[in-house]
């Protein structure tokens, strides 16, 4: 198993190009199951998660070919409807094939994803929505079996809480339903807007893009897709925080700053200088200021356009380097402080109280390198950020979590001047 080693204390400088968004690529890949033909997706990141979903789709009879960041998916010969446990257990997003399979084939058999390191994320919302559209759902022996006689039927679905994958799954299913479907209190993430754009390009009739109410007028069939994946806002935010934590200055390119408004507001509140244009964000310190001079800032995770839960751990690592106390409130997942114990191994001072964590920063000299273990994707990136700022060497284990969501991480950090390398254990 590989480990990532980081030699701390080297300020990052330069620019880093942001890859396509993992959280957009996965639903758009699943959406190609809705229609036969060759579908072209551009700016697709090469990640452990995208590879896993391609394996799931291969089991269904789909073929694919990658040329750089262009992925061609041929779903002409889609014939199987079962997503097996061996693959679904490694990535919860595999459940995104459920809606498209039921809509196109009239049936689907998908392994239940099981538990998740960062909290309970049941698929009940997906199933209740499909039942509203006329499907029969049975859960037994670790699988979900969904069937419908004929076409799905339009209906009104209300989400008690905005669910990103639930919105995506039911949005895809509804495109081929008979009649009109309304999704109320739907999630509003930019990745969902990206999916809407792709589906409309395939011939779907959808109203309400960027809003919490989506109206889908079902059509009998969809055509082939040719769509560009939006930039990864979480990757962009991670690198901005990493540059700040290292005490450096730089910029992220090929991003969409409007998708990061909440983070940029919080970073400016710490005293950092940020400038953004159409596709680039620059970050630096005021003259004569260092990481230790940063103001402590509280954050509260919220559904988009609020502060993203996927950037909570990274911001916490930055606050460990400020001087004073800040509060991190996590409202999306009930168990998303697993990185705290590992940060404490690096001398961080963090106290957890339910869904809140109080971070007492001790300045740039507060963190020291240590062996740490990644527990999930975003927790692992917070450990990398802490390692970049810490005194001495940090060893991050279980880096397969990083490979799920960060394309060419080692190469990109090295390009910014970091001293990072991988070794086999």
From Swiss-Prot:
Its EC number is 2.5.1.7. The active site is at residue 116. GO terms for biological process: cell division; cell wall organization; peptidoglycan biosynthetic process; regulation of cell shape; UDP-N-acetylgalactosamine biosynthetic process. It catalyses: phosphoenolpyruvate + UDP-N-acetyl-alpha-D-glucosamine = UDP-N-acetyl-3-O-(1-carboxyvinyl)-alpha-D-glucosamine + phosphate. CDD domains: UdpNAET. Phosphoenolpyruvate binds at residues 22-23. Disulfide bonds: none annotated. The keyword Transmembrane helix does not apply. UDP-N-acetyl-alpha-D-glucosamine binds at residues 92, 310, 332. SUPFAM superfamilies: EPT/RTPC-like. InterPro entries: Ankyrin_rpt, Enolpyruvate_Tfrase_dom, Enolpyruvate_Tfrase_sf, MurA_subfamily, RNA3'P_cycl/enolpyr_Trfase_a/b, UDP_GlcNAc_COvinyl_MurA. GO terms for cellular component: cytoplasm. Keywords: Cell cycle, Cell division, Cell shape, Cell wall biogenesis/degradation, Cytoplasm, Peptidoglycan synthesis, Pyruvate, Transferase. GO terms for molecular function: UDP-N-acetylglucosamine 1-carboxyvinyltransferase activity. Pathway: Cell wall biogenesis; peptidoglycan biosynthesis. PANTHER family: UDP-N-ACETYLGLUCOSAMINE 1-CARBOXYVINYLTRANSFERASE. Belongs to the EPSP synthase family. MurA subfamily. Cell wall formation. Adds enolpyruvyl to UDP-N-acetylglucosamine. This is UDP-N-acetylglucosamine 1-carboxyvinyltransferase. It comes from Desulfotalea psychrophila (strain LSv54 / DSM 12343).
């Amino acid at each position: 198993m590989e480990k990532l080693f980081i030699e701390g204390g080297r300020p990052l400088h330069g620019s880093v190009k942001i890859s396509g968004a993992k959280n957009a690529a996965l639903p758009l890949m699943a959406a190609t199951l809705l229609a036969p033909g060759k579908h072209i997706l551009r700016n697709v990141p090469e990640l452990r998660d995208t590879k896993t979903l391609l394996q799931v789709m291969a089991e269904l009879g789909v073929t694919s070919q990658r040329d750089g960041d262009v992925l061609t998916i041929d779903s002409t010969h889609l014939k199987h409807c079962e997503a097996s446990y061996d693959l679904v257990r490694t990535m919860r997003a595999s459940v995104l094939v459920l809606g498209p399979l039921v809509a196109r084939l009239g049936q689907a058999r998908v392994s239940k994803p099981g538990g998740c390191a960062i909290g309970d994320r049941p698929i009940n919302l997906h199933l209740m929505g499909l039942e509203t559209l006329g499907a029969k759902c049975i859960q037994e022996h670790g699988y979900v079996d969904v069937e419908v006689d004929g076409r799905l039927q339009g209906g009104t679905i209300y989400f008690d809480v905005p669910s990103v994958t639930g919105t995506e799954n039911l949005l895809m299913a509804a495109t081929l339903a008979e009649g009109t479907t309304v999704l109320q209190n739907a999630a509003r993430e930019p990745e969902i807007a990206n999916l809407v754009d792709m589906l409309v390009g395939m011939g779907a009739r959808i109203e309400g893009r960027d809003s919490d109410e989506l109206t889908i007028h079902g059509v009998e069939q969809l055509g082939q897709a040719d769509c560009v994946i939006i930039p990864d806002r979480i990757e962009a935010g991670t690198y901005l925080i990493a540059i700040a934590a290292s005490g450096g200055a730089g910029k992220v390119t090929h991003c969409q700053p409007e998708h990061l408004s909440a983070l940029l507001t919080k970073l400016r509140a710490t005293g950092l200088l940020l400038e953004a244009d159409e596709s680039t964000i620059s970050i630096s310190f005021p003259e004569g200021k260092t990481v230790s001079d940063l103001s402590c800032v509280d954050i509260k995770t919220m559904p988009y356009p609020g502060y993203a839960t996927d950037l909570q751990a990274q911001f916490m690592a930055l606050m460990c380097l400020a001087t004073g106390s800040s509060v991190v409130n996590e409202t999306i997942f009930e168990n998303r402080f697993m990185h705290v114990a590992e940060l404490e191994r690096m001398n961080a001072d963090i106290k957890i109280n339910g869904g809140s964590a109080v971070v007492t920063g001790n300045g740039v000299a507060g963190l020291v390198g240590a062996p740490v273990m990644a527990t999930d994707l975003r927790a692992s990136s917070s450990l990398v950020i802490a390692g970049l700022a810490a005194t001495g060497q940090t060893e991050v284990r279980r880096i397969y979590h990083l490979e799920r969501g960060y394309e060419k991480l080692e190469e990109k950090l090295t390009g910014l001047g970091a001293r990072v390398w991988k070794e086999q254990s």
